[in-house]
Amino acid sequence: MPIDNENYKSGVDLLLNKQNCESPNFKFYVEWIFKNLELHQSQNINDTAQYVFNQYVNSKTCLDKQKTFYDAIFKKLSSFTKLPVGAVLPEFEMKKINGDAYRFSDFKKEKVNIVMFYDPLCEHCKTEVPKITKEIEDLEKETNQKVGKLAVLNGNPSLWKDFVDKNNLKDWENVTYKDGDTKTQENLDAFANPKYYILDKEGKIILKTYGYSFVRSQLLQ
């Protein structure tokens, strides 16, 4: 069965039929659905994310009794509508780890590129970043192709260099926001840690999460 909006909506209806925010497994199912949708964003199934939210989450019951859950799903929904798959990551200005100015247009794009946002204090970042940098390094050796790699600090600059040194990021371009700049983070929808954009050679977003198998398949095409 092809992965498209109609098939996905039918599957969602089968799973969530007669359930609501007060049902025992409802939160687990909805979170699982959104995680799965994130992995398949390249299939252009953003309509399904909006459908799940409107049909099953956007209710007075959820808002009153599961406010934290409601807000979390609403935030996930925004990731499907802002900078969707197929959009070109916009131009931005930041600064390098040595303080020099940096423009995204300076980024040398390869066949496949990864833009990663992280905070050194984020527990998920501490485990995911070294794993990903190792996987990307291994993929480059296996396929004999370079991956464009840009790491954006979303946290305290005083922890920056140490995190780069310890997590195999020296081979990446390392940048962070200019002092006082909050607009760029908003424009890039980069408030989550870690957050990833996988881009093609033209800078178009082809995936909004990191997937080893996906990156490998793109390199081998």
Where are these predicted regions, by residue range?
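Oxidative protein folding and maturation machinery
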Residues: 1-102
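Short, small/polar residue-rich loop motifs at catalytic or cofactor-binding pockets
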Residues: 88, 111, 191-193
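Thiol/disulfide oxidoreductase modules built on the thioredoxin-like
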Residues: 169, 180-219
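Structural microenvironment flanking redox-active thiols in thiol-disulfide oxidoreductases
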Residues: 126-166, 181-184
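Short active-site neighborhood of thiol/selenol oxidoreductases, capturing the structured segment around
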Residues: 103-133, 149-152
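Generic structural signal for well-ordered beta-strand positions
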Residues: 102-103, 206
